[in-house]
Protein backbone atom coordinates (compact mmCIF):
# COMPACT_ATOMS: atom_id res chain seq x y z
CA UNK A 1 0.00 0.00 0.00
CA UNK A 2 1.31 3.45 -0.89
CA UNK A 3 0.32 7.03 -1.49
CA UNK A 4 2.08 8.62 -4.45
CA UNK A 5 2.08 12.25 -5.53
CA UNK A 6 2.69 12.50 -9.28
CA UNK A 7 3.66 15.97 -10.50
CA UNK A 8 3.03 16.37 -14.23
CA UNK A 9 0.16 15.52 -16.57
CA UNK A 10 1.72 15.58 -20.03
CA UNK A 11 2.31 12.69 -22.43
CA UNK A 12 4.96 10.85 -20.40
CA UNK A 13 3.18 11.47 -17.10
CA UNK A 14 -0.10 10.19 -18.53
CA UNK A 15 1.53 6.90 -19.55
CA UNK A 16 3.16 6.53 -16.12
CA UNK A 17 -0.12 7.22 -14.34
CA UNK A 18 -1.95 4.64 -16.47
CA UNK A 19 0.73 2.04 -15.64
CA UNK A 20 0.53 2.82 -11.91
CA UNK A 21 -3.24 2.36 -11.98
CA UNK A 22 -2.79 -1.11 -13.49
CA UNK A 23 -1.28 -2.29 -10.20
CA UNK A 24 -3.63 -0.83 -7.55
CA UNK A 25 -2.28 -3.27 -4.96
CA UNK A 26 0.96 -1.28 -5.11
CA UNK A 27 -0.32 2.20 -5.95
CA UNK A 28 -3.36 2.36 -3.69
CA UNK A 29 -3.69 6.15 -3.77
CA UNK A 30 -2.45 8.67 -6.33
CA UNK A 31 -2.68 12.44 -6.42
CA UNK A 32 -2.13 13.91 -9.90
CA UNK A 33 -0.87 17.49 -9.73
CA UNK A 34 -0.08 19.97 -12.46
CA UNK A 35 -0.11 23.69 -13.20
CA UNK A 36 -3.37 23.07 -15.11
CA UNK A 37 -5.71 21.15 -12.81
CA UNK A 38 -8.29 20.61 -15.57
CA UNK A 39 -5.88 18.24 -17.34
CA UNK A 40 -5.53 16.23 -14.12
CA UNK A 41 -9.30 16.12 -13.65
CA UNK A 42 -9.82 14.86 -17.20
CA UNK A 43 -7.27 12.07 -16.80
CA UNK A 44 -8.68 11.08 -13.40
CA UNK A 45 -12.18 10.82 -14.90
CA UNK A 46 -10.87 8.59 -17.71
CA UNK A 47 -9.13 6.28 -15.25
CA UNK A 48 -11.87 6.04 -12.62
CA UNK A 49 -13.85 3.21 -14.32
CA UNK A 50 -10.68 1.22 -15.03
CA UNK A 51 -8.92 1.04 -11.66
CA UNK A 52 -9.51 0.67 -7.94
CA UNK A 53 -6.67 3.10 -7.22
CA UNK A 54 -8.04 6.12 -5.38
CA UNK A 55 -7.24 9.17 -7.52
CA UNK A 56 -7.34 12.80 -6.44
CA UNK A 57 -6.07 15.90 -8.24
CA UNK A 58 -4.42 19.17 -7.30
CA UNK A 59 -3.03 22.36 -8.80
CA UNK A 60 0.62 23.22 -8.25
CA UNK A 61 3.26 25.44 -9.81
CA UNK A 62 6.32 23.21 -9.55
CA UNK A 63 8.61 26.17 -10.16
CA UNK A 64 7.68 27.42 -6.68
CA UNK A 65 9.15 25.32 -3.88
CA UNK A 66 6.71 26.70 -1.31
CA UNK A 67 3.73 25.46 -3.36
CA UNK A 68 5.24 21.99 -3.71
CA UNK A 69 5.98 21.86 0.03
CA UNK A 70 2.39 22.88 0.84
CA UNK A 71 1.00 20.17 -1.44
CA UNK A 72 3.27 17.47 0.00
CA UNK A 73 2.29 18.43 3.54
CA UNK A 74 -1.39 18.37 2.62
CA UNK A 75 -1.32 15.01 0.79
CA UNK A 76 1.34 13.20 2.90
CA UNK A 77 2.65 10.87 0.16
CA UNK A 78 5.22 8.10 0.56
CA UNK A 79 6.81 9.08 -2.76
CA UNK A 80 6.86 12.07 -5.09
CA UNK A 81 7.17 11.13 -8.76
CA UNK A 82 8.43 14.13 -10.70
CA UNK A 83 7.25 13.69 -14.29
CA UNK A 84 7.04 17.40 -14.99
CA UNK A 85 9.84 19.27 -16.80
CA UNK A 86 13.54 18.81 -15.97
CA UNK A 87 13.67 22.54 -15.20
CA UNK A 88 11.78 21.74 -11.99
CA UNK A 89 13.92 18.86 -10.69
CA UNK A 90 15.81 20.85 -8.05
CA UNK A 91 12.71 22.66 -6.79
CA UNK A 92 10.88 19.38 -6.24
CA UNK A 93 13.95 17.73 -4.67
CA UNK A 94 14.22 20.65 -2.24
CA UNK A 95 10.54 20.23 -1.34
CA UNK A 96 10.99 16.49 -0.74
CA UNK A 97 13.93 17.13 1.57
CA UNK A 98 11.95 19.76 3.47
CA UNK A 99 9.06 17.32 3.96
CA UNK A 100 11.00 14.07 4.46
CA UNK A 101 9.58 12.30 1.39
CA UNK A 102 11.24 10.01 -1.17
CA UNK A 103 11.79 11.32 -4.71
CA UNK A 104 11.86 9.93 -8.25
CA UNK A 105 12.19 11.53 -11.69
CA UNK A 106 12.64 10.58 -15.34
CA UNK A 107 15.14 13.14 -16.68
CA UNK A 108 18.08 14.99 -15.22
CA UNK A 109 18.16 18.68 -14.44
CA UNK A 110 18.67 21.42 -16.96
CA UNK A 111 17.92 25.11 -16.40
CA UNK A 112 15.09 26.97 -18.06
CA UNK A 113 17.22 30.11 -18.37
CA UNK A 114 20.58 29.13 -19.85
CA UNK A 115 21.66 32.78 -19.85
CA UNK A 116 21.56 33.09 -16.05
CA UNK A 117 25.07 34.34 -15.13
CA UNK A 118 25.46 32.17 -12.01
CA UNK A 119 24.43 29.00 -13.84
CA UNK A 120 26.45 29.98 -16.90
CA UNK A 121 29.67 30.22 -14.88
CA UNK A 122 29.21 26.70 -13.48
CA UNK A 123 28.21 25.38 -16.90
CA UNK A 124 31.23 26.81 -18.73
CA UNK A 125 33.56 25.42 -16.06
CA UNK A 126 31.98 21.98 -16.49
CA UNK A 127 32.30 22.19 -20.28
CA UNK A 128 36.05 22.73 -19.95
CA UNK A 129 36.54 20.05 -17.31
CA UNK A 130 34.21 17.35 -18.65
CA UNK A 131 34.42 17.95 -22.38
CA UNK A 132 30.75 18.01 -23.39
CA UNK A 133 28.48 21.02 -23.83
CA UNK A 134 24.96 19.64 -23.24
CA UNK A 135 22.87 21.86 -20.98
CA UNK A 136 21.76 18.86 -18.93
CA UNK A 137 24.00 16.79 -16.67
CA UNK A 138 23.81 14.91 -13.37
CA UNK A 139 26.19 17.08 -11.33
CA UNK A 140 23.43 19.32 -9.96
CA UNK A 141 21.37 16.39 -8.68
CA UNK A 142 24.26 14.15 -7.60
CA UNK A 143 25.20 17.01 -5.27
CA UNK A 144 22.03 16.15 -3.31
CA UNK A 145 23.14 12.57 -2.58
CA UNK A 146 24.53 13.26 0.88
CA UNK A 147 21.49 15.34 1.89
CA UNK A 148 19.09 12.54 0.98
CA UNK A 149 21.28 9.89 2.61
CA UNK A 150 21.55 11.86 5.86
CA UNK A 151 17.76 12.34 5.85
CA UNK A 152 17.21 8.59 5.38
CA UNK A 153 15.49 9.20 2.06
CA UNK A 154 15.80 7.71 -1.42
CA UNK A 155 16.09 9.74 -4.63
CA UNK A 156 15.91 7.74 -7.87
CA UNK A 157 17.06 9.77 -10.86
CA UNK A 158 16.30 9.07 -14.51
CA UNK A 159 13.79 6.29 -13.86
CA UNK A 160 12.13 6.10 -17.25
CA UNK A 161 13.14 3.75 -20.06
CA UNK A 162 16.17 5.62 -21.35
CA UNK A 163 17.52 6.67 -19.00
CA UNK A 164 16.30 4.11 -16.48
CA UNK A 165 15.65 0.63 -17.82
CA UNK A 166 18.73 0.93 -20.02
CA UNK A 167 21.01 1.24 -16.98
CA UNK A 168 19.20 -1.63 -15.27
CA UNK A 169 19.86 -3.82 -18.31
CA UNK A 170 23.55 -2.86 -18.25
CA UNK A 171 23.85 -3.47 -14.51
CA UNK A 172 22.17 -6.87 -14.86
CA UNK A 173 24.45 -7.80 -17.75
CA UNK A 174 27.53 -6.81 -15.76
CA UNK A 175 26.43 -8.77 -12.68
CA UNK A 176 25.06 -11.91 -14.31
CA UNK A 177 26.24 -12.24 -17.92
CA UNK A 178 29.75 -10.83 -18.43
CA UNK A 179 33.10 -10.89 -16.67
CA UNK A 180 33.81 -7.41 -18.01
CA UNK A 181 32.09 -4.95 -20.34
CA UNK A 182 34.20 -3.18 -22.97
CA UNK A 183 31.59 -1.30 -25.00
CA UNK A 184 27.96 -0.28 -24.57
CA UNK A 185 25.74 0.92 -27.42
CA UNK A 186 22.17 1.92 -26.58
CA UNK A 187 19.86 1.96 -29.61
CA UNK A 188 16.56 3.82 -29.16
CA UNK A 189 14.11 2.93 -31.93
CA UNK A 190 10.48 4.01 -32.28
CA UNK A 191 8.66 1.55 -34.53
CA UNK A 192 5.33 3.39 -34.40
CA UNK A 193 3.72 5.50 -37.12
CA UNK A 194 1.32 8.23 -36.02
CA UNK A 195 0.64 9.39 -39.58
CA UNK A 196 2.01 12.90 -39.06
CA UNK A 197 4.85 14.41 -41.07
CA UNK A 198 6.29 15.84 -37.85
CA UNK A 199 5.56 15.23 -34.17
CA UNK A 200 7.68 14.67 -31.08
CA UNK A 201 7.17 11.77 -28.68
CA UNK A 202 7.58 13.94 -25.58
CA UNK A 203 7.84 17.63 -24.70
CA UNK A 204 8.69 19.32 -28.04
CA UNK A 205 10.97 21.95 -26.52
CA UNK A 206 13.09 19.40 -24.63
CA UNK A 207 13.11 16.97 -27.56
CA UNK A 208 14.23 19.52 -30.15
CA UNK A 209 16.92 20.98 -27.90
CA UNK A 210 18.28 17.49 -27.24
CA UNK A 211 18.37 16.44 -30.88
CA UNK A 212 19.80 19.68 -32.27
CA UNK A 213 22.61 19.86 -29.68
CA UNK A 214 26.13 18.49 -30.31
CA UNK A 215 26.39 14.73 -29.84
CA UNK A 216 28.91 13.12 -27.52
CA UNK A 217 30.08 9.73 -26.32
CA UNK A 218 32.42 8.27 -23.70
CA UNK A 219 35.66 6.72 -24.94
CA UNK A 220 38.83 5.69 -23.10
CA UNK A 221 38.01 7.68 -19.98
CA UNK A 222 36.94 10.97 -21.54
CA UNK A 223 34.16 12.63 -23.53
CA UNK A 224 34.28 13.00 -27.31
CA UNK A 225 31.98 15.69 -28.70
CA UNK A 226 30.81 15.82 -32.32
CA UNK A 227 28.58 18.12 -34.41
CA UNK A 228 24.86 17.40 -34.08
CA UNK A 229 23.62 14.41 -36.10
CA UNK A 230 27.05 13.90 -37.71
CA UNK A 231 27.35 10.16 -36.96
CA UNK A 232 24.68 8.10 -38.68
CA UNK A 233 24.25 4.33 -38.72
CA UNK A 234 21.74 2.01 -40.36
CA UNK A 235 20.44 -0.82 -38.22
CA UNK A 236 17.87 -3.55 -38.78
CA UNK A 237 15.66 -3.81 -35.70
CA UNK A 238 13.78 -7.01 -34.95
CA UNK A 239 10.07 -6.70 -35.84
CA UNK A 240 10.60 -3.09 -36.95
CA UNK A 241 13.00 -3.22 -39.89
CA UNK A 242 15.85 -1.04 -41.06
CA UNK A 243 16.07 2.44 -39.56
CA UNK A 244 18.46 5.37 -39.71
CA UNK A 245 19.86 6.20 -36.28
CA UNK A 246 22.06 9.06 -35.09
CA UNK A 247 24.49 9.43 -32.21
CA UNK A 248 23.20 11.80 -29.50
CA UNK A 249 24.37 12.96 -26.10
CA UNK A 250 22.16 11.26 -23.50
CA UNK A 251 22.25 11.32 -19.73
CA UNK A 252 22.68 7.60 -19.09
CA UNK A 253 26.10 7.74 -20.75
CA UNK A 254 27.24 9.87 -17.82
CA UNK A 255 25.88 7.53 -15.14
CA UNK A 256 27.08 4.37 -16.92
CA UNK A 257 30.59 5.80 -17.24
CA UNK A 258 30.55 6.38 -13.49
CA UNK A 259 29.15 2.98 -12.51
CA UNK A 260 30.78 0.76 -15.16
CA UNK A 261 34.22 2.40 -15.25
CA UNK A 262 35.84 -0.48 -17.14
CA UNK A 263 33.77 0.29 -20.26
CA UNK A 264 36.06 1.65 -22.94
CA UNK A 265 33.27 3.20 -25.01
CA UNK A 266 29.62 4.11 -24.33
CA UNK A 267 27.35 5.52 -27.03
CA UNK A 268 23.66 6.34 -27.49
CA UNK A 269 21.79 6.28 -30.81
CA UNK A 270 18.22 7.30 -31.63
CA UNK A 271 16.23 6.67 -34.81
CA UNK A 272 14.70 9.51 -36.84
CA UNK A 273 12.85 9.63 -40.14
CA UNK A 274 13.88 12.09 -42.84
CA UNK A 275 10.63 14.05 -42.52
CA UNK A 276 11.30 14.69 -38.81
CA UNK A 277 14.83 15.92 -39.55
CA UNK A 278 13.67 18.17 -42.41
CA UNK A 279 11.08 19.83 -40.18
CA UNK A 280 13.58 20.23 -37.34
CA UNK A 281 16.16 21.88 -39.60
CA UNK A 282 13.51 24.23 -40.95
CA UNK A 283 12.59 25.28 -37.39
CA UNK A 284 16.28 25.66 -36.58
CA UNK A 285 16.88 27.85 -39.65
CA UNK A 286 14.15 30.31 -38.61
CA UNK A 287 15.34 30.45 -35.01
CA UNK A 288 12.49 28.49 -33.46
CA UNK A 289 14.60 26.00 -31.51
CA UNK A 290 15.56 27.28 -28.09
CA UNK A 291 13.96 29.53 -25.49
CA UNK A 292 15.00 32.90 -26.92
CA UNK A 293 12.09 35.03 -28.14
CA UNK A 294 11.98 35.48 -31.92
What are these regions (language model features)?
Residues 9-10:
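Glycine-rich Rossmann-fold phosphate-binding loop(s) that bind the pyrophosphate
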Residues 107-153:
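Rossmann-fold NAD(P)-binding glycine/threonine-rich loop
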Residues 175-293:
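C-terminal catalytic/substrate-binding lobe primarily of soluble NAD(P)-dependent oxidoreductases
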Residues 13-14:
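N-terminal Rossmann-fold NAD(P) dinucleotide-binding loop
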Residues 60-77, 84, 88:
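Conserved Rossmann-fold cofactor-binding substructure of NAD(P)-dependent oxidoreductases
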Residues 50-64:
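Rossmann-fold cofactor-recognition segment
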Residues 36-39:
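Helix N-cap at the beta1-alpha1 junction of Rossmann-like dinucleotide-binding domains, i.e.
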Amino acid sequence: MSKVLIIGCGGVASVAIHKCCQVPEVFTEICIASRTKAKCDKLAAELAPKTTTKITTAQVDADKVEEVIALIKAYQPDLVMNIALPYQDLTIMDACLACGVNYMDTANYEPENTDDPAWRAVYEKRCKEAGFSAYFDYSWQWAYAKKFEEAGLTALLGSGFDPGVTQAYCAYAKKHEFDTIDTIDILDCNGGDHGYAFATNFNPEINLREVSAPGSYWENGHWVEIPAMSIKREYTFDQVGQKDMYLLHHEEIESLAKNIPEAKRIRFFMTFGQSYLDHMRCLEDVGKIGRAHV
